[in-house]
């Protein structure tokens, strides 16, 4: 987890400068000098350039997939009312987009309702104008980073085993859950995500030091 610290710090710094990477995923992260760093800012944009994010959202909406690294609120925010109804209907009639099954698994890992329920809730919030556009855009990268590790262990039983086996994993997964909340108003901020990540790192590094000290005492 220590290797991921620059990713959380980078998230915080980008947010402070109102820059959205807009494409955080495994192939856009490299290992450099023992830590992970972001690369490929080809889809990045300034928070103020709303049309940039609108076009990216509509491009994905016109495809046949759910871009799994994007939150549903971003994918659907700029859709027409009839298009929103169509998306719900697609899932109801089993003509869902590619990756819908993955979305379902991720929500199960975090103890949430099905992907359909999440989409229905987001659609209702968009229709009722309950989602703030700026808050939604600021939440894109937070969601993308939060979903990374659970996706690496895609099979749900592997994720469940990891969480049951370790308090450390369980606490980090709780942070990932906050980062991937379906509604942007409930999603943790980049600054708070970094703060909580650092707190967890410090907590478990101290525990490791104590364990090492105890082992040395036993040997002596």
Where in this protein do the model-derived segments appear?
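Regulatory extensions appended to serine/threonine kinase catalytic cores
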Residues: 205-220
């Amino acid at each position: 987890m220590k290797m991921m610290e620059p990713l959380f710090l980078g998230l915080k710094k980008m947010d402070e400068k109102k820059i959205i990477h807009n494409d955080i995923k495994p192939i856009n992260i490299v290992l450099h000098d023992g830590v992970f760093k972001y690369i490929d800012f080809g889809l990045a944009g300034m928070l103020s350039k709303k049309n940039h994010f609108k076009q990216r959202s509509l491009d994905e909406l016109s495809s046949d997939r759910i871009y799994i690294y994007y939150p549903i609120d971003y994918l659907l925010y700029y859709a027409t009312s009839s298009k929103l109804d169509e998306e719900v209907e697609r899932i109801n009639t089993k003509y869902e987009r590619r990756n819908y099954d993955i979305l379902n698994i991720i929500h199960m890992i975090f103890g949430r309702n099905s992907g359909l329920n999440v989409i229905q809730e987001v659609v209702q919030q968009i229709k009722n104008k309950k989602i703030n556009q700026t808050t939604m855009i600021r939440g894109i990268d937070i969601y993308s980073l939060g979903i990374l590790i659970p996706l690496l262990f895609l099979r749900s039983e592997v994720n469940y085993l990891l969480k049951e086996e370790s308090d450390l994993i369980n606490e980090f997964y709780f942070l990932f859950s906050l980062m991937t909340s379906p509604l942007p108003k409930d999603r943790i901020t980049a600054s708070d995500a970094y703060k909580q990540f650092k707190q967890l790192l410090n907590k478990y590094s101290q525990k490791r030091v104590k364990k090492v000290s105890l082992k040395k005492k036993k040997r002596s």
